[in-house]
């Protein structure tokens, strides 16, 4: 059996206004090669962008990999490593019996994560971590670029 490739992925999400224009930024490192990705949406939330970034990164991998995925989002990290198990058992309801927010993205992240061996890591945001700072720049630039793309799953609070 061949050994899985080790990929380092760094992600960040940004939103101006929350809700408002938003974007995500991704930096992927593999054997000295770096790939950056980002995109923006006209109306979304910070949490949706924090979830979409690792989804896009994992979906971009062409084969199963060993991944070290680093984000400054405790929401994303806690959700995918801890909370998701209970949500799935309860039919995507929280412990208060309310529907899980951003369920479309949680399901997509769960599916994308199944294909890889992932070490989910957290880094403090805005603390000088080079890749995290770069992701932040990419995400903010995407949000500030007057994006017109619609975040199809975004549902405003009523």
Swiss-Prot record:
SUPFAM superfamilies hit by this protein: Ribonuclease H-like
Top EC class, one word: hydrolase
Cellular localization per UniProt: Cytoplasm
Residues covered by the RNase H type-1 domain: 3-144
Pfam families: RNase_H (PF00075)
Reactions performed catalytically: Endonucleolytic cleavage to 5'-phosphomonoester
Stored PROSITE patterns: RNASE_H_1 (PS50879)
Swiss-Prot/TrEMBL keywords: Cytoplasm, Endonuclease, Hydrolase, Magnesium, Metal-binding, Nuclease
Residues annotated as binding Mg(2+) 2: 12, 136
Enzyme Commission number(s) of this protein: 3.1.26.4
Residues binding Mg(2+) 1, per UniProt: 12, 50, 72
Positions in coiled-coil regions: none
Highest taxon above the source species: Bacteria
Cofactor(s) annotated in UniProt: Mg(2+)
Known role: Endonuclease that specifically degrades the RNA of RNA-DNA hybrids.
Protein name as it appears in the record: Ribonuclease H
Protein's organism: Shewanella sp. (strain ANA-3)
The gene coding this protein: rnhA
């Amino acid at each position: 059996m061949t050994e899985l490739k080790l990929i380092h992925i760094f992600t960040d999400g940004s939103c101006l206004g929350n809700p408002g224009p938003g974007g995500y930024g991704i930096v992927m490192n593999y054997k000295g090669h770096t790939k950056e990705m980002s995109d923006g949406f006209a109306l979304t939330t910070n949490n949706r962008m924090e979830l979409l970034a690792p989804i896009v990164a994992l979906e971009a991998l062409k084969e199963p990999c060993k991944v070290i995925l680093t984000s400054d989002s405790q929401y994303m990290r806690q959700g995918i490593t801890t909370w998701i198990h209970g949500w799935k058992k309860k039919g995507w309801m929280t412990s208060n019996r309310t529907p899980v927010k951003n369920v479309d993205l949680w399901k997509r992240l769960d599916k994308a994560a199944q294909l890889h061996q992932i070490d989910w890591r957290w880094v403090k945001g805005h603390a000088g971590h080079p890749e995290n700072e770069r992701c932040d720049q990419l995400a903010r630039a995407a949000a500030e670029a007057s994006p017109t793309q619609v975040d199809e799953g975004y549902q405003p609070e009523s």
